[in-house]
Amino acid sequence: MESKEAKEKGVNTSDSKGSQIESSISDLREKSQHLFGVLLEPQVPVIQYGLNQLEEKARNLESKVLLTRDGDTKAHYLLAESGMNAEQTRQKIYSIHIHSPWDQLELDKKSLYEQPHTKLYNGQNVVASIENGYQSNVYEFQLRLMKNNGIAWENTKTEFMEDVGKLLHSKDNSGLGTSISMSLRPNLARPLLTASSVKSQSVRSLREVGSNLPIPTGSLTKIDGLNNQLSNDLTRSQTTNIFGFAEKASSFAAAVHKLNEARIRNQACHVWSLFASVSQMVNTEVIQLFDAWSLLAHMIDETRYGMGDFEARHLALDSSSAALAVEKNCIEGSLKYLENQFLSLIDLHLSDAGHITTVNSVEKVIAYSKLRFYKNGSWIKSTVSVVNDVPLWVVLFYLMRSGQLDAALQFVNTYSDDFEKLGRSFPLYFYSYAKNPSLPLPKQLRDRLQAEYGQLMKYAPEDPFKHAIYKLLGNCEPHRVSLPEVCVTSEDYMWIQLMFCRVNQNDVIDSNGGQSTNSLFNLYQLEKKIVAFGPRYFNPKNNTPTNYFLALLMCGEFERAISFLHTNYPVEATHFAVAMAYYGLLRTKNYEKNENILIYEADDVKINFPQLIIAYLKHLEYVDAAVYLDYIACIPLVPAYQACSINLTKILLLQSHEFSKFLGDIKPDTERTTGLLDLYLRLIPFDHDSLQKLYLEGAREADDDGRFGDSIILYHLLGDYDTVIGVAIKNLSQSIVSRGLWSIDSKESKNMHISSNVVASEAPDALAANLLAMYESNPKKSAKVSATNKKALKVLLKVVKVQKLYGQEKWDEVLQLIEHLDLLPINEVQAEFEPNEQIPPISARLRRRAFEFSTFQDEVLSVIPSLMYISMSSIKALYRTISKLPVVNEESKKKLQRLQFKGSMLVMFSTMIESRLSPQILEYLQAEQLTLL
């Protein structure tokens, strides 16, 4: 027991000791932490300012101290004695504030302590500013990228639009689909336009050699031949059907050239056929553009009408005879075109379906009607009226739609009983309509028909084709055309609308029943309707932009049609405008220098024809200047633009610098050859004063640019032959100087302007010699050339000969010719070789020659340094040759003395005219003269 108690007591003792140890350890830990904190606690509070904060605090303290100080008193007295106001000076000094780049980064320390959340907001602002900077940089990069890409895009925009226009062509259009877009198929008939009609015309170019064309009034000579021919002719062979912009433009340019050839010859030109043949060749994927030429040919018969026949249209009112003639041609031509198109479509569908083509029109249309509405042994349209397996109203409508009115009348006669059952008075209506379909029915019949039509509309449904026929016969509700089962294509819609149009012939209309002209649906109202619909109505799928163009043509809106087509097909639009201007179909406006092709005036629109041509010419690059002239010559097709064409021709001539091509070249008999401008005077009517101003302006510009060949031609045309020789002198002088003082190379300077005309292609010395010979052979023209210029030119020609002899190392001949020129005093005779006696008279002679030197022309003076160099070099070479002879006799010694004398004279003379010589020449002459001693 005791042992057990002892054990328990021992355990308790050990537990108490353990708890004491643990408490002491915890106390020590707590005390040590407290001691650590006491030791680390600073005696002064920790400064919570950074360096920038300390700097700002110091500035604040400094400002407070400065406010309490009044400065040094002695300094005040000292400054006052010197006349300075200390207070004002101090204010001026403290008013100066030098901005530090770190000022904007200083923070308000007080607000930072008082408002701790401000720091968070500032951080957010920094992040936001970084994000904004990043976004702005990205935006600027995108703009720069788009701009750089846009440069290349603008350069190829036209060609791209041409390719896009091809891709927009519908690939799945059917002849009679549900879409309202026009679907003109390549297989459709295109009468009046054949390639043979173009190929049969002469293909000889105005630029061909030997082309016999009559010379227009104002031309100086007959045609000698022109060397340039259009690079791409209309009949050239092509290996591909896909034409780019350049190929297309060159083909149309050839056609425009043929048009101008016909105009110059005063011959008629079949413009529609001419341009259509090009369109058929280059627009194989956009066949509607070719169909547009066919449509225009139906409107304006090119075999009947000629250039400017409808010119009065744009000057007259809409009720004038010229305007009414165009309106009538538009209606009748468009209807004929659409009817022929539909008839060809019938043949195409029957052929595709394997039907045997029949000559009988009625049987053909019946077969086509069954092909459309008879499927799998039953009629697919329950509203179609079928009698004896023949859909009467369908067949009759299609006969009318295809323009076969005689066949339609025969069909009504054949089925008259059946038609009477379906419409009691219908045969009577149709017989009256067939007599003159362009006029309304007599009033009595028209009232009866319109009453039946009202009942037909009231108790619908009826056969939709019967509805359409009644609507056409009675001219019922022409402003409302809602026949979706009949007008399945835009062609159908335009055909019905055009059938409603009537020409406002008041006397004819009133005598046939008194129908008011105000109730007629005329072409003007159709124009407004089509324009109000806009292109989206005729091109809902955005795949055939030419549909709206064709619709505008059909209603006579030629100006809007050209402007709309120009967006996607600028090449075709330009040539459509040229062809229309040929016949006078365009309403134009006085030329204004703006970029608007279409100009709106109240309810009318007019086209800026010159601007259209200029816009097209801007797209042409690397083409012959004659191509530009061809298009400029088309501008006077509108007579009001003759002055504009003259100004554009001046600009073309002055910028192209091809004066010999346009104005002719000089022939050996001093006359000139015929230029292109002579041939085009019938098209671009330059008068004599305008030509003289053009010659003078071009000559001055050529002088400034250093184009001596052009300058010579233009001054020759002006009749200023003395100036011609003066220009030749200047040209020859510069050629001599450009060869250099130390070189005998006869190559022309690289800095000289090169002209493409015949005059400038000759060497300057040959040109000058030819001009001098030509004028001297003609006494009248020679009298107009001054003797001074003749003498100067002859002197320069001899200098050229001196250079050639010098290059051949013919030293004796060089010195003899220089002595003959008498420009340098090396031919002074030495009577006695006594220097002391001869110096005074020789010195006097040299002074006299130096005085004469100042009277020379500048062109002659400029070659003197080169001539002095050649003289001294020849003297030196000849002196060395004689000195190296094995035996030097008395005659050789005299030659050496004469050479020494010539060298001395040359050096003495150079010192008298040293102001006109370069230091290099003077040093060379003096150095070489020493070698002769």
Swiss-Prot record:
The modification Phosphothreonine is found at residues 217, 221. The keyword Acetylation does not apply. The modification Phosphoserine is found at residues 219, 237. Signal peptide: none annotated. GO terms for molecular function: structural constituent of nuclear pore. One of its GO terms (cellular component) is nuclear periphery. Keywords: mRNA transport, Nuclear pore complex, Nucleus, Phosphoprotein, Protein transport, Translocation, Transport. Residues 11-24 have a biased composition (Polar residues). InterPro entries: Nucleoporin_int_Nup93/Nic96. It is found in: Nucleus, Nuclear pore complex. Residues 1-10 have a biased composition (Basic and acidic residues). GO terms for biological process: mRNA export from nucleus; poly(A)+ mRNA export from nucleus; protein import into nucleus; stalled replication fork localization to nuclear periphery. Residues 1-24 are annotated as: Disordered. Its main location: nucleus. Has a role in promoting mRNA export from the nucleus. Belongs to the nucleoporin interacting component (NIC) family. Homodimer. This is Nucleoporin npp106. It comes from Schizosaccharomyces pombe (strain 972 / ATCC 24843). The gene is npp106.
